[in-house]
């Protein structure tokens, strides 16, 4: 399933939400979402199960939980207004869904920055088969 996330990002002809999230991640971490986060741990990328492997993976788990609360929104494709300046991500005015999706992404990108010091390259292309057991509750 995670491969679908990469394909989706590569096939989007206009700036869609996933590309916006990638820009936020790069702004905060100075790393591209692909390859540094698309397959990281058990939750970064599309889907997830088991326990988060570390602080970076937990950021992705919390991001998934945030999206889970937005079931009526098109979390993968809605384009939202935002700006990157003076060291901050600022979500702009939009529809309720756009504002909520932007906040989920902003919080996740900032979380990934805070967890940079514990980023483990061994989790960078972590196989789904090693993500076992029940998922934590959001």
UniProtKB/Swiss-Prot annotation:
Site feature (Putative interfacial binding surface (IBS)) residues: 18-19, 23, 26, 33, 38-39, 76, 119
UniProt note on tissues of expression: Expressed by the venom gland.
Binding positions for Ca(2+) per the UniProt entry: 43, 45, 47, 64
Enzyme class: hydrolase
Gene Ontology MF, one: calcium ion binding
Keyword Membrane: no
Signal sequence region: 1-16
Family matches, as SMART domains: PA2c
Catalytically driven reaction(s): a 1,2-diacyl-sn-glycero-3-phosphocholine + H2O = a 1-acyl-sn-glycero-3-phosphocholine + a fatty acid + H(+)
Enzyme Commission number, as recorded: 3.1.1.4
Residues the record marks as site: Responsible for the weak stability and toxicity: 17
GO cellular component, one term: extracellular region
Site note Responsible for the higher anticoagulant activity (compared with CBa2), residues: 133
Cystine bridges: 42-131, 44-60, 59-111, 65-138, 66-104, 73-97, 91-102
Other information: The crotoxin heterodimer is inhibited by the crotoxin inhibitor from Crotalus serum (CICS). CICS neutralizes the lethal potency of crotoxin and inhibits its PLA2 activity. CICS only binds tightly to the CB subunit and induces the dissociation of the heterodimer. Tested on the CA2-CBd heterodimer.
Protein name: Phospholipase A2 crotoxin basic subunit CBc
Top-level taxonomy: Eukaryota, Metazoa, Chordata, Craniata, Vertebrata
